[in-house]
Amino acid sequence: MGDFNLALVIVAIVVCVIVFISSIYLLVNYQHPDDANQAYFPKFVVVFGLSIAMISILMLPADVANRHACRHSIYNGACNLTLPMKDLWLAVYIVDAVLVFFIIPFAMFFYEGDQDKALGKRIKSALIWVVTTAVVCALVLGILYGVIGKVDFSVRHLSSATTTFPTSWQFSNNQPCIGNTARQCSAYTANAASEKTWSMRTTFPEYVVALATIVGSVLFTIFGGVGIACLPLGLITAFIRRPKAVITRSQYIKEATELGKKARDLKKAADALHQEERSGAKGRKWRKNVKAVEKELLQLEEDVNLLEEMYPQGEQAETAWAFTVLGYLAKFVLGILGLIVSVAWIAHIIIYLLVDPPLSPFLNEVFIKLDDVWGLLGTAAFAFFCFYLLLAVIAGAMMLGLKLVFITIHPMKWGATLMNSFLFNVGLILLCSISVIQFCATAFGYYAQATAAQEIFGHTLQSLRGIKYLYKYNVFQIGFVVLAGLTFLYYIAFGWRRKKPSGRFQLST
């Protein structure tokens, strides 16, 4: 056993308890009042899903610590590792896949079902959708695993000749056992291009994790690439667009009247869509109109919040305005800090992943030096950079949801988040968390070397037949950097401008 095994077990247990409590805290404080004392099954799924997502992110630092406990061993097999990390990785990600593709869709269909229907009919309707999805997924997985569920490792064939053992037994320190001509194996003169392909079938759990990672990587590349730029720049532009002064009472009455009129128009549109839903006319046009109304509702809520900020009321009006000013200053500071982290991420991807050979270990060296300062400092910084990517994914999904009609918006608001939005975001986090771990295991390969995560994500996944070329040519990393650059240019060109009315429910000027 390693020197720090007991401490590692204690830390793992404590972290799991903290994660579970944090998930409950987020649910209680973000849930909508309409969901209080009901929707218990979706709430259980949300808490369990959030816990799995956070634990999966923290498992990579735990994997590194698990390996460091055996750093004095000559080879990995010489140490009895505390935690069976490979089994834990596979178990967590199988649970992750089941939640994303089966449990969360069932909970969403059940929650969004017609409340006027009986409980049994709502369960039956949700089960039909989930069973159909399960059958399709099982067929696709089974066919793909049977046909191309193999890994192809490129190996170099090395061989050497044998030397007859002498029988004279007359040796000295000047006469070695093996002759001078046999000190080098024939591999010393082997052709550098003498490579062969060693194929073997991967295990089914590893194949499920691999395919889930591919699906998550596509979403992670799009949302994460956009989000890593818009997360800090959005905070900075919010500071630039902040209200500079309190408006007069007459201006407030004018704007409030206009917003009230727009709210009534929006309610009429929502009622009309609800009538169409009851009549069964839920076609493509209906879904498009629903998404348009959702976007207009979000914009209306933003306008109301902005109006309340520009005209604080009550006995503590001056205090409220002071907190508003401080809030925007905090956004600016957090935006600057986030911009530094985002630039560090992009720079690390370019100089360590896209340049071959890498120009520098960069953040890997930073984490190692922080570990030398204090044992958990590098691990904490490592976990922070991984969590930052998840925040970027959520920010990117929100931005694209507001800009593109075909992407559904599920905003997270303090004290006003419905369970379907909770479930959607938990599913997105779970799906992208697999890719975040794979991305971090690759990006921080020098720091996380010889871990179980690297064995799964760095060896098996990147050698999987039909998939390996996506990683061989850095498709996801290039897409991530390109989207981040385009988003940055968008904010430079348009982000500093104050928003102008663009729709029927916009705040008037």
UniProtKB/Swiss-Prot annotation:
Query: Organism, per UniProt?
Result: Arabidopsis thaliana (Mouse-ear cress)
Gene Ontology cellular-component annotations: plasma membrane
Coiled-coil region: 251-316
Task: Decide whether keyword Coiled coil is in the record.
Answer: yes
Q: How does it sit in the membrane?
A: Multi-pass membrane protein
Instruction: State the UniProt keywords alphabetically.
Output: Coiled coil, Membrane, Transmembrane, Transmembrane helix
Give the top-rank taxon of the lineage listed in the UniProt record for this protein.
Eukaryota
Q: Where in the cell is it found?
A: Membrane
The answer on whether this UniProt entry bears the keyword Coiled coil reads yes
**Which family is this protein grouped under?**
Belongs to the LIMR family.
Q: Could you tell me what this protein is called?
A: LIMR family protein At5g01460
- Major subcellular site: membrane
TM region positions: 8-28, 44-64, 90-110, 128-148, 208-228, 332-352, 382-402, 422-442, 475-495
